[in-house]
């Protein structure tokens, strides 16, 4: 019998506890998943993190992480761009290929009205906008983020230290 999928809409995702405005860290608290404190990567039902298929609007994402030298500390997915997710922890059909442990299917949101926003969090600054066109027959969405861990590390670095502090910087943009 297939395992029941866990489906979450935008509001439910925002209510999950997570760090750094990271969708993957929110997924990491769902039943059947496990992960580390430092990395955004998660595993499903004891498998390896790369045994889970990740799709965004039916397109497979390979290694969707920033700062891979730091164990993929943040995902490339802006939670502001996501309308919903569905996690299937096992028991899925061959349609999903050779993945063994699970499927994480994400769908981007479709704006219902024109709106824009900017924000700042503990680790990220972001801006997004979305709206309708053609009399409401279509919608558009744009999102950009810039992580600023590099600024934080430079600010707390010891001036007597001979080596330069690590400079973990990242940015991403999304549009549809």
Residue locations for each model-derived region?
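Short aromatic-enriched loop/helix-cap "lid" or pocket-rim segments at secondary-structure transitions
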Residues: 1-3, 97-100, 130, 153-155
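Periplasmic N-terminal accessory/gating domains of Gram-negative outer-membrane beta-barrel systems
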Residues: 1-93, 103, 107-110, 124, ...
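Short loop/turn motifs that connect adjacent beta-strands in outer-membrane beta-barrel proteins
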Residues: 35, 94-96, 111-115, 133-138
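Residue-level detector of the transmembrane beta-barrel scaffold of outer-membrane proteins
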Residues: 53-55, 84, 103, 115-119, ...
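Outer-membrane beta-barrel translocator domains and adjoining extracellular loop/strand segments
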Residues: 69, 152-159
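A generic structural micro-feature
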Residues: 96-98, 119, 167
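Gram-negative outer-membrane beta-barrel proteins
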Residues: 112, 126, 148-154
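Transmembrane beta-barrel wall of Gram-negative outer-membrane proteins
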Residues: 121-146, 160-176
């Amino acid at each position: 019998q297939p395992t029941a999928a866990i489906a979450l809409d935008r509001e439910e995702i925002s209510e999950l506890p997570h760090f750094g405005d990271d969708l993957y860290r929110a997924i990491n608290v769902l039943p059947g998943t496990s992960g580390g404190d430092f990395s955004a990567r998660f595993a499903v039902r004891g498998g390896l993190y790369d045994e889970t298929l990740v799709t965004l609007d039916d397109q497979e994402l390979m290694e969707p992480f920033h700062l891979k030298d730091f164990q993929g500390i943040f995902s490339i997915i802006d939670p502001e761009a996501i309308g919903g997710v569905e996690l299937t922890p096992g028991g899925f059909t061959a349609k999903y290929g050779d993945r063994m442990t699970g499927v994480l299917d994400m769908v981007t949101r479709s704006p219902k009205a024109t709106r824009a926003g900017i924000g700042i969090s503990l680790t990220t600054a972001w801006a997004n906008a979305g709206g309708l066109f053609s009399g409401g027959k279509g919608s558009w969405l744009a999102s950009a983020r810039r992580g600023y861990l590099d600024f934080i590390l430079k600010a707390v670095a010891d001036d007597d230290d001979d080596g330069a502090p690590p400079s973990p910087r990242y940015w991403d943009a999304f549009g549809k």
